[in-house]
C-alpha cells in the first residue's frame, strides 16, 4: 500500500465512520490509537472502544496508551513515521511534541461549525441552545482547544424536534464524508487553511449531571431543548414525589399555570406548566422502571391535575 502513512486516533462509535472512510479509500493506515478498554455494565466487564473493534477486524495495529503525552508514546508514534495523523473524538489532548511529528500535520474532525462550540460536547450544546444549524469542521490541530486553522466545513440543519442520538448519527457520517474531501484537497494542494476568528468563538463544555436538572421556571422551549439535547446522557430530570423522573421526548404546548404543575394528562402526554408556555411530555422513565410513553406511564402512575414536579437534586 502506497500513499501517505496515516495514524488514526479516535475512540467512540462517532469516530468509526471516519476510520471506515479511510479503509474504503484504501488509505495507508499504519496504526490506530484509542483509549484503553473500560469497565461497563452491571458486571463491570472490560469493553473495548468501538474504534478498536473496527481496526482489529481490518488487521490494523491498535495502541491504547492511557496517556499519549508521555515521552515513550511520543517516540513510539515518531517511529511509525506518519505523514498525517487524523483525530476524531479521541478523548485526549495531544501535546506539542506529538503535533509536530507528521509533516502534513494533525487533522481533527470536529462536530461543530468552528469557531463556535469548541470543546467536548458540541452536538449536545447546539441542541440545548436551540441552534437550527450546525455542521462539521476539519482543521489543522495546534496546542489550543479546537483553535487551529480550518480546512473545510459542511453544514446541516437541526430539526426542531431532533434529539442528540439522531444528530449524532447524522454528524458521524457527515464527518466521514468531510474527511475524505479534506484528504483530497490536502493531497492536491487545493485547500488554503483559514484562521479562526476567536471573537466569534463559544464553548461546549463536558457534560455534567447538573446540566440535566430541569427548572420549570424557564420557558417551555428551553426545557424542550434541554430534554432533546441531553437525552443520551445525563438525561433531563425532575422529581415526582421525591423520586427522580427522567424526560426523554417532549413537545411545546400553549397551557399556563404555576411552573411545574401538571395541568393536563391523556394519551397525547402529560402537560406541565412552565415559566412561559407548557411542556407536553411524551416519553419518560421513573426510577427503577423502563423508559415508556406517557400513556403507559399514566396507566401505572395515575397523576392528579395540580401535582407539582419539583427540582431534582444530584447526589454524588
Curated annotation (Swiss-Prot):
GO molecular function annotation: methionyl-tRNA formyltransferase activity
Enzyme Commission number(s) from the entry: 2.1.2.9
Sequence positions that bind (6S)-5,6,7,8-tetrahydrofolate: 112-115
Protein name per UniProt: Methionyl-tRNA formyltransferase
Biological role stated in the UniProt entry: Attaches a formyl group to the free amino group of methionyl-tRNA(fMet). The formyl group appears to play a dual role in the initiator identity of N-formylmethionyl-tRNA by promoting its recognition by IF2 and preventing the misappropriation of this tRNA by the elongation apparatus.
Family: Belongs to the Fmt family.
EC main group: transferase
